[in-house]
A protein has these predicted regions:
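Phosphate- and other anionic-substrate recognition elements at nucleic-acid/protein interfaces
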Residues: 1-132
Length: 132
């Protein structure tokens, strides 16, 4: 059974403390998906490189897990140029078998591509700032 593709060009991110693994899935008119993968530093320079890499591949829809606090700088940089979806890890549970960061990023990309990820609520900056 094939799943319906809702996003023909999107990216799944596996975010860690010091690096990010990115997987862009690009689906052609025949339904074949080609993946482009890269690893970036999670520091400022790496985040700019990630943003540039996404733009180079005309990818403006991104999904990542809300892993601790590590997603925050990634979200803050990418929301300037992309539509960013933050997913609770329970909705991106990986497949069984050998788990790698490359496979995790591809799995998030596949789930996002097929619209199978429920987005987490992120309060607007004004609401989040006024709560403290």
């Amino acid at each position: 059974m094939a799943f319906k593709i809702f996003r023909k060009n999107c990216c799944g991110l596996d975010v860690h403390k010091t690096w990010i693994f990115a997987c862009i899935g690009i689906t052609d008119a025949n339904g074949r998906t080609e993946y482009k993968q890269a690893r970036f530093s999670s520091f400022s320079g790496g985040l700019r490189e990630l943003s540039d890499w996404l733009a180079k591949h005309s990818c403006f829809e991104v999904c990542m897990e809300s892993s601790g606090k590590y997603w925050i700088p990634v979200f803050n940089i990418l929301e300037q140029t992309c539509s960013v979806t933050l997913a609770h890890p329970k909705y991106t549970k990986p497949r069984k078998g050998n788990k790698t960061d490359r496979k995790d990023a591809e799995w998030i990309c596949d789930l996002f591509m097929c619209d199978m990820i429920k987005p987490s609520f992120i309060p607007p900056r004004t609401s989040a700032n006024s709560a403290t």
